Amino acid sequence: MRWRLLYGLMMTIMFFSHTVVAALPTWERPAFIENAFFHVALEYEFTSTTAPRLAKWSHPIRVWFRHDVGHQALHEEMARLHLAHLAQLTHLPITVVARRADANFIWYFTRQSEWQKIIRTELGEKALNNIYGSVCMFGVKLDPDSHEIRRATVIIPVDQARSHGKLLGCIIEESTQALGLFNDSEQAYPSIFNDKTPDDFLSPLDIILLKLLYEPTLTSGMSPSVLQPLLQQLLLQYQQQGKLKQALYQSRHAPIVEQFGR
């Protein structure tokens, strides 16, 4: 089977009435959320496309961890806490398996001296063109017909991530992006997908984007023109049901936040 490979990375960049809408935080406005969704879910870092399509998982995710460095229990605890939160938000079955052969989501905790070799092996030679200034990386393989995500890889060089104060950020951002929110964009704020956001944890906007992505009415392969009316309908429902406001609580009380704090 042919695969389409997409990859992304964390960069070290330092740096409806009108009355009701005006009173809302920017991230809570439906039009802002819709725009952010299109920029984050329908565009790809380092890969251009003239026919963007939605991509998501439709099968259970089975994660296998490869540890090349110490503090294995701590690193895996962080990852498992975040994976549990992702499963809760998306309703995807996400489990950890003991054998690589049983996994469709490979997660490396490695060292900087090894990560280029791992990237070359797992993501291909071309992925090495985009590592300048990066801290960690993810890649996914898509079914070319359905556009469903079939496999994913997360690669975190722990020493490099720690030196930038980004270990938690790498764990959260790369695994979240590997679910289908591939692109970093300044159109999303506050968000882990915006390098100007100071917080490494999922924001309320991120939670809404994840929930939208895994709504059953949105399916892999959908084009922007098909998605737009469905998104608008969902956002109206979210607003009426209080889901937009609930996202703030879910962000503040994420398992990894309660364990490791902001």
Regions flagged by a language model, labelled:
Residues T47, K126-K166, F182-R262:
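Metalloprotease/metallohydrolase-associated module, dominated by Zn2+-dependent proteases
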Residues V69, H75-I172, Q177-A178, F182-E186:
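Metzincin-family zinc-dependent endopeptidase catalytic domain
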